């Protein structure tokens, strides 16, 4: 078998299924561990989560009228279909704090709204501070789905400048992600995932590409997916505000520069005109030839002929 097929079937072998059974057997122990070691700052959120888990356990163990609630299952499937995932399975977070939906949203009734709020209250979000190199969202979803059903998943791509620099010097052309957030349908599954994988190897087959990668994952108590989308929208707004401020400052600098250039041209033209007017006041003297005439009635001074110059004498000497 090729290396790619081994990577795709890392977590589908019988050994992994046995490991999965062991992990879910430890679920009750880890949940009790969380109840015993909560901090003072997170007591209020943990109490609410415990109540939600009890309500969730009651609904799971005691279905209404001895039948499964197929409406919840259908609603979850519809919500998963409406999630805007890209080709890699990464949830697309829009600026308005929600996922992209092509169809028009229908108004929810009071019952549907209460049901949706209850579903959101049951969810839990984990933060992944480091994503294994070149791991795609679809692969991460298949790895973490061992612990429970995953609703949405978002991985932050690396900076484009870093990617272009790596490719320019002959590096790997695959996409790389820096951090991510994973939303579990049940917060107990999110706690179990964080307690099991945090600080440990990803595991699987030894031939796996991600076998030795250390996972750093943390459960975020009281944190919902809406908080993440609002935070991203806020960061985008701050970035747009900074960009608009820089553009306005640059426009002011350009206007001041153009006005200064026009003023300098105007001053230069004024000074040039002043110089021309000053030059016109200068009185110039021109040498003129004396007036002579051959008229008989003219004065003797005017009848005198001009004396030959040196140039004329030289020419006459050469001729004669």
Curated annotation (Swiss-Prot):
Residues 124-214 form the RRM domain. Gene3D superfamilies: 3.30.70.330. Residues 1-98, 272-309 are annotated as: Disordered. One of its GO terms (cellular component) is nucleolus. Keywords: Nucleus, Ribosome biogenesis, RNA-binding, rRNA processing. It comes from the Eukaryota. Its main location: nucleus. Residues 40-56, 73-90 have a biased composition (Acidic residues). Coiled coil: none annotated. Residues 27-39 have a biased composition (Polar residues). Disulfide bonds: none annotated. InterPro entries: ABT1/Esf2, ABT1/ESF2_RRM, Nucleotide-bd_a/b_plait_sf, RBD_domain_sf. PANTHER family: ACTIVATOR OF BASAL TRANSCRIPTION 1. This is Pre-rRNA-processing protein ESF2. It comes from Candida albicans (strain SC5314 / ATCC MYA-2876) (Yeast). The lineage of its organism: Eukaryota, Fungi, Dikarya, Ascomycota, Saccharomycotina.
